[in-house]
């Protein structure tokens, strides 16, 4: 049961989403035997959010050398997640080693860079936090298939600019809002340490 304060905080998110996550999904996801899959899926979603922000910067805002630096920054996270290479503890200290140079031809490049870099840092921090929670609960990382939710939304992205960029940003907003809504509703069903996260 959600507190009245949390219900009030979620109200704008519910209005944006237009429909709530079904109770059947919540009761299934909240079962302790599904905790490993829930955390692994969340881990992958954090990385995909960082990758999406990186794609937007690379596609619309930065020069080639900056794009290469972004790829190198995310590579260890991708290697761990998709190829199961490396030790997750080594991911803690990784950061971007280069300033991002905006494309001269873009009026919004610097603003997009600034906002998306903050988002990438936040998502990679959350990625590492999920790994810590998994370690605390003796949950080993194993590859699982990606959720179909984002793929379903992205099918509706228009193929011409600037509408394609706008559509991708809107899809990202829906994905983030749904994640927020689901975890707020799941929190009372999860162990305290995970609920606090």
What are these regions (language model features)?
Residues 1-197:
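Non-heme di-metal
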């Amino acid at each position: 049961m959600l507190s009245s304060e949390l219900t009030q905080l979620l109200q704008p998110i519910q209005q944006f989403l237009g429909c709530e996550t079904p109770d059947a999904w919540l009761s299934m996801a909240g079962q302790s035997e599904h905790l490993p899959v829930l955390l692994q899926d969340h881990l992958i979603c954090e990385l995909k959010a960082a990758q999406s922000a990186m794609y937007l910067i690379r596609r619309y805002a930065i020069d080639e050398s900056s794009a290469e630096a972004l790829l190198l920054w995310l590579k260890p996270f991708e290697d761990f997640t998709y190829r199961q290479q490396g030790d997750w503890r080594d991911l803690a200290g990784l950061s971007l080693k280069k300033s991002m140079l905006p494309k001269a031809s873009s009026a919004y490049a610097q603003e997009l860079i600034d906002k998306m870099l903050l988002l990438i840092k936040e998502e990679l921090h959350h990625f590492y936090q999920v790994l810590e929670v998994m370690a605390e609960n003796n949950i080993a990382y194993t590859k699982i298939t990606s959720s179909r939710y984002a793929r379903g939304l992205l099918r509706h992205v228009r193929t011409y600019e600037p509408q394609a960029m706008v559509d991708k940003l809107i899809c990202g907003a829906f994905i983030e809002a749904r994640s927020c809504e689901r975890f707020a509703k799941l929190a009372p069903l999860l162990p305290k340490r995970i609920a606090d996260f």
